[in-house]
């Protein structure tokens, strides 16, 4: 699509979203567009520090978890000693960026609003790790905590998965992986999905939206995919193109959140319509005036805080 034909997104977003877009961090250098992936990861971590400030304090523990690929770092957020369930959180970042620090505030707020233990899994990034390594690491971490639940004093009888953007894909893919391979890690009570991608290769929103402001041009999306997948055949895997999986049965209750001006919005709409058509428990909510990744900005955006509360409320309602 010719860029001039796209919607003038920055003129259409909400006032609070514009405030975020126009917020400058004077001590921060410009984005290293031509830098190495290591430099871009470092920048992303530095840039997110401002947005992570002021998060709720709670008991926090870090553990290294064994997987067949090596040790994976996890971080537990425990808002109360008697948690009714455990939520595994998978951060976004296009499979190539992000870590437990970049999404710290999101995980803390989710733990606070749900009063459930939240476990962030620092899966290995791409291109160092190729599909399906991240999913296998997530599943290994779930199995580890299920087996060691008493030692770590966590409730693994009921669990959930949550994630934003690429992390949303990983969240749902991990839940489907456990179902399909009949791996018991506790009952999956719900899956919380904020503005994820689930397998579409083209859509109306991908044509009309996406630009330098969100890093989601068609070229950007292709770059993330090429970094994540091992080969062309992986594009059709039911754990990458989730629409190629069986979404007609035994899908855990899904909270599906969409951002109005997100090029990935049609992925969320299609996922919701597919699940609803087959009587799978799900809820879709569109957040007006928002861009992709708005969940990070709860320091300034009431809508971001609302979206986290909505997800937490959906999850606790399933318990």
UniProtKB/Swiss-Prot annotation:
GO terms for molecular function: carboxylic ester hydrolase activity. The active site is at residues 165, 262, 292. GO terms for cellular component: cytoplasm. Its EC number is 3.1.1.-. The keyword Ion transport does not apply. A motif (Involved in the stabilization of the negatively charged intermediate by the formation of the oxyanion hole) lies at residues 91-93. The keyword Hydrolase applies. Keywords: Cytoplasm, Hydrolase, Serine esterase. It is found in: Cytoplasm. It comes from the Bacteria. InterPro entries: AB_hydrolase_3, AB_hydrolase_fold, Acetyl_esterase, GDXG_lipolytic_enzyme, Lipase_GDXG_HIS_AS, Lipase_GDXG_put_SER_AS. Belongs to the 'GDXG' lipolytic enzyme family. Homodimer. Interacts with MalT and MelA. This is Acetyl esterase. The lineage of its organism: Bacteria, Pseudomonadati, Pseudomonadota, Gammaproteobacteria, Enterobacterales.
